[in-house]
Each structure stands twice: as structure tokens, then as C-alpha cells.
Amino acid sequence: LLSDFKCYCRHDNFLEIKNGYDYEEVHDVRFQSQFTMAFVGRFYREANPTNWFKAFSELINEEKLPSDCQIKIIGNLSKLEVPEDIAPNVSHIEPVAHTEAIRMSLDVDTLVVIYSTGRKGVYTGKLFDYLATNKPILALCDPEDVVGRLLDETKAGFTVDNADIEGIKKMILRCYSIWKNKEVLPRDWEKIRRYTRKNQCKILLEYLANETGIYAV
């Protein structure tokens, strides 16, 4: 979006404000009795779990993941094509209030975000919600795009191209190993806290104060 502004506008004086999160960060991590991955929100035609399901299925069939590993889909309304062999592993949960979705995200071991291949410069609100959960984030996206850079910066998770089945399998196994060994990723909390909504609003107010002199921070 910023790139488009720079192309079509006569100046480049732009400020990008992220969505951010507005709840308390979590430091007391709970591990589930079975390795559990989750996606919170809705899928769309180009951003769907097909390759995630395929990689998960192959890992179970190859006996690299235990057969009782779980996937939770929370809040999706569209019909999903779940491979028959992992249908018992996949649970579908009706849409819930945002605060309840945050609570439910704490009762899993890996949180997944999925972006369509080739989609650039887009964050989702759930990504910022995930940052403060202290759960590993697995992003299926362009690792060189903004989501990959955010996860590298905050050390909150991993990225892999959504079209790379073998790469997705490797990252699922990495997340599984973290769960199995009861590890907690060494997040950079100082950088994560930059993405609270309070701090994002502060950036906006400082910008307005500097540019217009109207607002005092």
C-alpha cells in the first residue's frame, strides 16, 4: 500500500501504523497433552489450508508425527476439503468473540497464519494477536515479505512458502520438537511491545504533533 502511495502521489511523507494488539502478554506457557496446531479466523480462496493439511497428513503417514496430533480451526465458515486420513485430527470450532478466540489460542502449541502465494505487503490482525501469546507462530507466506521480516525481528516464529510442501513439513516438525521438548521460543519482547495498539497510537500522535502541531503527546 505504501508503495502504491509513493507511485501515485506527489510526495513520500507517509507513516505506516500497524494493527497491533491490546491484551496482556503471556509468560506462563501451557503445553497441551497432544501436539496441537491452530488457525484462528476465516480462510479464503487463495489463502487456504490445503498445503498445510497435505504436509500434516504426509508427516503422520510417514510416522514422523504421532497419529494423535491435532489441528483446531477456530472461526472459519467456509467448507474445507480435509484429507480423509486426518479428518479425525481436525476439529472445527464455531466463530467466537475476539476475547474468547485469544483465550483459546493459549490452549494450543503452534499458531498458524496463511497468506496466498504472491500476496505482498499484507499483515493480518491475528498475526499481532499471536505475538503476545508466547506460542510459536508458523506463517505460510513469502519469507521475504513483511510477515517474514516481522517474525524474524521479534523471534516469534517461522516462515515458509505456502507452495513448499517439504518446507512446510520441516517447519511443522520444528514446532513439534519445541512442544516435545517443552521449549519456549526466546521472543524479543522489547520489539514485540512496539506493536501494542497503545504504542502504535503513540507513533501516530507523535507524527501528527510533528507535522501539524495540533496534537500534543
Label every PLM stretch briefly.
Residues L1-F14, Y23:
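A short, active-site helix/loop in glycosyltransferases that binds the activated sugar's phosphate group
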Residues I17-G20, F31:
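Carbohydrate-associated surface elements
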Residues V29-A47, F53-F56, Q200:
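Conserved donor-binding/catalytic core segment of Leloir-type glycosyltransferases
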Residues E63-I102:
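Nucleotide-activated donor-binding/catalytic signature segment of Leloir-type glycosyltransferases, i.e.
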Residues A97-D109, A132:
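Short acidic alpha-helix that forms the nucleotide-activated donor recognition element
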Residues S105-V122:
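Acidic donor-binding loop of glycosyltransferase active sites
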Residues A163-G167, K180-E211:
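A charged, aromatic-enriched C-terminal amphipathic alpha-helix characteristic of glycosyltransferases
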